[in-house]
């Protein structure tokens, strides 16, 4: 049984001894992991800790402003650094999921390295948790914040030393710690948000238009699903191009866009399939059949129109530890409201779908 008070009592002397009189840059994304790590360090080390939020251009709608407001009491010295144009222009046009994640990692730590020099900091504090390095070591997908665990020498590569106080904790334990540290509920109970943000929800080639489409769609999805307290819920966008196939008697539409999955504890990068479902609650039979092929995510069609070039998929899951997850059984009328608003408010969206794939065989994020 995890005891946050004991954890803080144990980690405190270790952190103080390691840091000494040096400065620590704490990378904050606004998610529960990185923010908890930063607040833990700030409480223990005071103004030696410089918390920084890098706005990469892949944050949710108005997110940087919201995070700064949420954390005004627990991280009063939080600095927001605007790197939106740098990240977007460097990754724009890139298509393959792992290539995008790795480029993001390169840009992120290059930016961090510059900030470390600017603030004369020796240590970088990160919110890496157990699920991050398990997935990266297993080759399922690159988590941008997993470095030492896969043999990257941060001292040699970027000139700083890593501190990861949460690396042995799972998400539910981090939340307990966040509550103990009195983080605002908007953070402690916040659903996870990947470090690369909307980059990994803009499936396939990154374009500025598609990025803005998913930013707006994600905002609508969160608005409707917030009251349900699902473990994680969001939207992804991808081009609607593809072709119809028949697999084991099932009529399916295979998109050209591909997505990450996990089969037998190893990474799979396969097709996204659409099927017509009369009821999302009974869609498991479709999934069990289709994932035997090169398919990682199975989507149920919700609503569509004749024009438009983008598909929006809604993803909502229920999980304890994020190592496995089941898709949420969202009420039909709620899905209808979400679909209707997305099609009404966002130009160039052709259809709205719902992901009915568990983890495994899918990963929670598409990339």
Swiss-Prot record:
Molecular function per GO: ATP binding; GMP synthase activity
Domain of life: Archaea
Any one of the GO CC terms: cytosol
Source organism of this protein record: Saccharolobus islandicus (strain L.S.2.15 / Lassen #1) (Sulfolobus islandicus)
Gene transcribed to yield this protein: guaAB
HAMAP family: GMP_synthase_B
Positions with a binding annotation for ATP: 29-35
Residue ranges annotated for the GMPS ATP-PPase domain, each copy included: 2-190
Protein name: GMP synthase [glutamine-hydrolyzing] subunit B
Pathway terms, separated by semicolons: Purine metabolism; GMP biosynthesis; GMP from XMP (L-Gln route): step 1/1
CDD domains tied to this protein: GMP_synthase_C
Coiled-coil ranges (or none): none
The protein's enzyme class: ligase
């Amino acid at each position: 049984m995890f005891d946050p008070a004991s954890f803080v009592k144990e980690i405190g002397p270790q952190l103080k001894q390691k840091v000494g009189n040096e400065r620590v840059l704490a990378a904050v994304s606004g998610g529960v992991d990185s923010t908890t790590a930063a607040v833990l360090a700030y409480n223990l080390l005071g103004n030696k800790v410089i918390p920084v939020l890098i706005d990469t251009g892949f944050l949710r709608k108005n997110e940087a402003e919201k995070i700064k407001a949420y954390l005004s009491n627990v991280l009063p010295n939080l600095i927001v650094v605007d790197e939106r144009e740098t990240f977007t222009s460097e990754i724009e046009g890139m298509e393959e999921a792992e290539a995008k994640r790795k480029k993001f990692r390169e840009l992120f730590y290059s930016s961090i390295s510059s900030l470390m020099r600017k603030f004369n900091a020796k240590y970088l504090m990160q919110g890496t948790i157990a699920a991050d390095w398990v997935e990266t070591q297993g080759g399922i997908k690159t988590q941008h914040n997993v470095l030492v665990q896969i043999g990257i020498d941060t001292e040699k590569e970027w000139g700083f030393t890593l501190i990861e106080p949460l690396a042995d904790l799972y998400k539910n334990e981090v939340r307990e710690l966040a509550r103990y540290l009195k983080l605002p509920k908007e953070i402690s109970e916040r659903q996870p948000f990947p470090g690369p943000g909307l980059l990994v929800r803009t499936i396939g080639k990154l374009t500025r238009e598609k990025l803005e489409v998913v930013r707006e769609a994600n905002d609508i999805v969160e608005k409707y699903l917030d009251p349900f307290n699902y473990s994680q819920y969001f939207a992804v966008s991808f081009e609607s191009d593809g072709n119809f196939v028949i697999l084991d008697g099932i009529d399916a539409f295979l998109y050209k866009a591909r997505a990450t999955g996990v089969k037998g504890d190893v990474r799979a990068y396969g097709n996204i399939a659409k099927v017509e479902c009369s009821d999302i609650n009974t869609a498991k039979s479709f999934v069990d059949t289709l994932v035997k092929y090169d398919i990682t995510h199975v989507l149920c069609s919700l609503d569509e129109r004749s024009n438009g070039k983008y598909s929006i998929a809604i993803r909502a899951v229920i999980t304890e530890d994020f190592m496995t997850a089941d898709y949420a059984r969202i009420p039909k009328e709620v899905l209808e409201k979400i679909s209707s608003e997305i099609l009404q408010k966002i130009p160039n969206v052709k259809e709205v779908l719902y992901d009915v794939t568990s983890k495994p065989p899918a990963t929670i994020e598409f990339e």
